[in-house]
Amino acid sequence: MAMLSSRRVAAPAKASAIRRSRVMPVVRAAAASSEVPDMNKRNIMNLILAGGAGLPITTLALGYGAFFVPPSSGGGGGGQAAKDALGNDIKAGEWLKTHLAGDRSLSQGLKGDPTYLIVTADSTIEKYGLNAVCTHLGCVVPWVAAENKFKCPCHGSQYNAEGKVVRGPAPLSLALAHCDVAESGLVTFSTWTETDFRTGLEPWWA
């Protein structure tokens, strides 16, 4: 009798162990499957973030890419033809149709540097252009028409409407370039080697 009862006790224990062993894999499988949506969401978010981050980079690249195209061969009068944002040679007549008196807009100048073309009060092309590269650390300085000055967004340097430095840390004024209109109508730049009319000093860039 004692042996029989021990067999009866052992049987339920063995059955219970079998049931536990069958249940455990199911629990693990459920846990694993519950992680799948999280991973999918994470991957989707990564793609969205990567795509979103690429937009401003692409925009900036398109905006400044025009200033890295090879310079034009020249304007026929010894100068180098100025180019617009699309890389086309600038013709004074066409430019003045869309750029009014007092306008200062970027073009591609000597050595491919971004250079401001200036429209005078009587709606002609100014006799000089301004290199837009800040003399502090080389940022491109935007023209702020509302304040009638150039203001560097990198470290706060400021230049007046003629490109003369009026606030540091930039140590020097923006470089000048001669700007002329050739007989063909092309706007051309050439190196400024004379005295800087803004400071009365020799040009630091020559």
Curated annotation (Swiss-Prot):
Q: In the Enzyme Commission scheme, what number(s) does this protein have? A: 7.1.1.6
Tell me the PROSITE patterns matching this sequence: RIESKE (PS51296)
Tell me if Manganese is a UniProt keyword of this record: no
Molecular function in Gene Ontology: 2 iron, 2 sulfur cluster binding; metal ion binding; plastoquinol--plastocyanin reductase activity
Q: Which reaction does it catalyse?
A: 2 oxidized [plastocyanin] + a plastoquinol + 2 H(+)(in) = 2 reduced [plastocyanin] + a plastoquinone + 4 H(+)(out)
Tell me where in this chain the Rieske domain is found: 92-188
Q: What is its main location?
A: plastid
Q: Which InterPro entries match?
A: Rieske_2Fe-2S, Rieske_2Fe-2S_sf, Rieske_Fe-S_prot, Rieske_Fe-S_prot_C
The record's listing under PANTHER family reads: CYTOCHROME B-C1 COMPLEX SUBUNIT RIESKE, MITOCHONDRIAL
Q: What is this protein called?
A: Cytochrome b6-f complex iron-sulfur subunit, chloroplastic
Species this protein is from:
Chlamydomonas reinhardtii (Chlamydomonas smithii)
